């Protein structure tokens, strides 16, 4: 992967939404470490008299983002930074998931065109590489989608997180969903931290985490259960489906400790 920072160019009529978010959390950390650069591009600066929208042909209600400001902004980026991989936010676009995030993290330049109003003039699609969405619902604009892309991609770039293991522990990055997490105090209002996590027994903790990852996936997202299971995963999955608890299963598998 290139040692150069991954550059995000966000075409929007609300650039402050992007610049504000870039001052916090993982994105700020990625920028500070030189792994990411975020450029909010105000479409009004590329529009004659600042007009970025107009009425749609065909008598539909609402307004549509004009093609000229977007093409002008695109040309500016190409001339000054090089050709980017272009995303446009659309409700019917490909849903953002961890696999796509990992693919995007390998790009050098990503442009995100934020939709608004009734949409973007279809002629803009000529420069678009991918339509992208967060799900089957409507947002007021694409800025939230753009921020999700920037945040998710930034955190998987090598060197951004201070603890790289955190990435592998993430739901969706791992084969299974995440496991329950706990912190101090050990007991609160009668609710105790599982004794396995306090044991200091690394293999026991590892098995506990795997069991609860699989259990979490079975209960919350059974559609994500992998098909290529290891023998241990098959054993745990079948035990969960049969109604066994972790402690019951562990009694039968003490040889794993």
From Swiss-Prot:
Enzyme class: transferase
MF terms (GO), sorted A to Z: tRNA (guanine(37)-N1)-methyltransferase activity
A Pfam family per the record: tRNA_m1G_MT
GO cellular component, one term: cytosol
GO BP term (any one): tRNA N1-guanine methylation
The keyword Transferase appears for this protein: yes
InterPro entries found in the cross-reference section: Alpha/beta_knot_MTases, tRNA_m1G_MeTrfase_C_sf, tRNA_m1G_MeTrfase_TrmD, tRNA_m1G_MTases_N, tRNA_MeTrfase_TRMD/TRM10
Keywords for the protein's UniProt record, in alphabetical order: Cytoplasm, Methyltransferase, S-adenosyl-L-methionine, Transferase, tRNA processing
Quaternary organization: Homodimer.
Protein name: tRNA (guanine-N(1)-)-methyltransferase
